[in-house]
Design a protein with these regions (language model features):
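Short acidic/polar inter-strand loop motif in beta-rich domains
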Residues: 129-136
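Sec/Tat signal peptide C-region and signal peptidase I cleavage site
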Residues: 17-21
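Aromatic sugar-binding surface patches on proteins
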Residues: 103-110
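Beta-strand-rich domain onsets/edges
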Residues: 22-61
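Short amphipathic beta-strand segments in non-cytosolic proteins
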Residues: 83-95
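Short, aromatic- and glycine-rich surface loops/edge beta-strands on solvent-exposed regions
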Residues: 121-128
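Bacterial N-terminal signal peptides
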Residues: 5-16
Length: 147
């Protein structure tokens, strides 16, 4: 049962169009970083409880995964050292403590942070595959709505 507890979260995060999926991924040689950020009130209470995530309109879940392979083709999940931080438009920053979550062969890195209504955040992620892959850095911007 616990093995499939993350499945509803993954379905939610993957319910995006192919164009959005390409916008939420970046290729670095033999590796692809997939990333997303969503308000935690999208999570079911069970998923939030299982992963110690507070459900709230004012909290955002950042998810990152690193795959070995080509963008648009199913790749092999790779463990990585992942760090991240956020910055709002007034340059207030917060370091995230990305924690690893494994579900079968899938490997994800997650953390949450607080936002206010209509706040735009820059999210900076650095990932280094433990199998010797390159250090990869991405930045994405997203506006969050809490009302």
């Amino acid at each position: 049962m616990k093995r499939f507890a993350l499945f509803p979260l993954l379905v939610l995060l993957l319910m995006i169009t192919p164009v959005q999926a390409q916008q939420n991924a970046q290729q670095f040689g033999d590796y692809v970083i997939h990333y997303n950020a969503v308000n935690t009130d999208f999570l079911t209470p069970e998923v939030a409880r299982n992963y110690g995530i507070q459900r709230s309109k004012n909290r955002v879940l950042v998810t990152v995964s690193v795959l070995r392979g080509e963008m648009g083709v199913a790749g092999k999940p790779v463990a990585a050292k992942v760090s991240a931080h956020t910055a709002n438009l007034t340059d207030q920053t917060k370091n995230l403590s990305m924690r690893e979550v494994r579900d079968g062969e899938a490997i994800y890195y997650i953390d949450t942070f607080s936002v206010t209504n209509e706040e735009t955040m820059d999210i900076f992620v650095t990932a280094t595959p433990v199998d010797g892959g390159p250090r990869m850095s991405i930045k994405f911007r997203k506006q969050f709505f809490t009302k």
